UniProtKB/Swiss-Prot annotation:
Pfam hit, one: Ribosomal_S3Ae
GO MF terms held by the record: structural constituent of ribosome
Family: Belongs to the eukaryotic ribosomal protein eS1 family.
Gene Ontology BP terms: translation
Superkingdom of origin organism: Archaea
Name under which the protein is recorded: Small ribosomal subunit protein eS1
Keywords, alphabetical: Ribonucleoprotein, Ribosomal protein
The species this protein was found in: Methanocorpusculum labreanum (strain ATCC 43576 / DSM 4855 / Z)
Gene Ontology cellular-component terms listed: ribonucleoprotein complex; ribosome
Positions in coiled-coil regions: none
Amino acid sequence: MARKKQSGGRKVEGWKAKNWYKVHAPEFLGKQFIGEIISSNPENVPGRVLTVSLGELIQDYSKQNVRASFKIMNVAGDAAYTQFNGHEMTKEFVRAMVKKRASRVDSTITVTPLGSTRELQVTITAFTINHARLSQVQELRAKMVKVVEDSAKEADFESFVSAMLKGELSKKMFAECKPIFPVRRIEIIKSESVSSAADRAAALIR
């Protein structure tokens, strides 16, 4: 019994030695409070990733099936500030979008938003109403990719991510693709911040 009490005491002391840090979303999302993490050393906080419901973050119920992740970049006092790290629609939601006698058109590309040193790998998916022929699938894919690449050339990183998360890019792709073939929905189902070519080259030199 004495050993158990001592063990419990050490655990309490260990928890007391740790601090809670309030994690905030990036500035383009209003620096909203998105959660808390605990650490005994503030130097160990940067680099950690927090994943939250996008629907709750931007107050849009239609985005409840989307999870967004944010990477902590720096700490000031008990506040931890993040940058966008990526997002993903739940696999269950994506599967539910696939209907019989219809086509699913996917494309994964990497874009570098205007003036940014950060790259984003995005997966675009179109769900058609009817089965599409190969030529129609290819045309849909090319149009989706063009819309996203053109948008990245015209918007900085924060503006591009905001348009992606809020569905503005999806609406633009839908409008452009609808004349090609009847589509039911087009979404960027996943994105991930990846190292730029310059960063990869610098890492090799080091």
